[in-house]
Swiss-Prot record:
This is 4-hydroxy-tetrahydrodipicolinate reductase. Catalyzes the conversion of 4-hydroxy-tetrahydrodipicolinate (HTPA) to tetrahydrodipicolinate. It catalyses: (S)-2,3,4,5-tetrahydrodipicolinate + NAD(+) + H2O = (2S,4S)-4-hydroxy-2,3,4,5-tetrahydrodipicolinate + NADH + H(+); (S)-2,3,4,5-tetrahydrodipicolinate + NADP(+) + H2O = (2S,4S)-4-hydroxy-2,3,4,5-tetrahydrodipicolinate + NADPH + H(+). The gene is dapB. It comes from Streptococcus uberis (strain ATCC BAA-854 / 0140J). One of its GO terms (cellular component) is cytosol.
Amino acid sequence: MGIRIIIAGYRGKMGSTALSMAQNEEDFEVVALLDPNAKEKEFQGIPVYNLKEDLKTIDAEVWVDFTHPEVAFENTHFAIEQGFAPVVGTTGFTSKEIENLIQLSSDKNIGGLIAPNFAIGALLLMEFAERAAKYFPNVEIIELHHDQKKDAPSGTALKTAEVISKERQEITQGHPDEVESLPGARGANYQGMHIHSVRLPGLVAHQEVLFGGPGEGLTLRHDSYDRQSFMQGVKIGIREVVKRNQLVYGLEKLL
């Protein structure tokens, strides 16, 4: 018997990709699916539920969540309370919510993962950006996603800004007296760094980190052209959280 998995949001693009992946792994067993709008009672032989409360009696080890920002915290809290180790790709968590979930998981002795990005290339981009920030404190982030993404900026962009801030000398990027003739033209501001969000049909998930210095520039870019790019990270998350006793934020903490 493999690792028993519940997938929340199985009808979405990421959830359906995760379901296909899990069905092709010998050590994974999908035991339940959750979607509040699903009309079918089972899908490909797997029981389907509309209410998470109905999953309390399910014998499962891992809760995979690709739902929506407005329900992600509640779902993850529920999963930990029920003893399901969460692997969450849904973004939009606040810092306080993450702290709350880490504490709850520690109290319950349950592993878990909230990952802004499951692509290995995106993790490397963040690592390289952190190293570069020591030498290039002038930096801006541009993240580009499909036009159905509900939160902005992306969790990956926020995580990138967080890791950069560990090494970066905090400065205000741009002219101190600059004026926006059109409000929002300079994007969001995170500790003096500007973050810009692009939403267009045809995109999947992309990010650029632009560094500037006297007479030179450095651009780091990662592109996910297909949602398959995230599945290696999801596999790692599922296999690792069952060995842990506390939730972590960021896939890199399980590598």
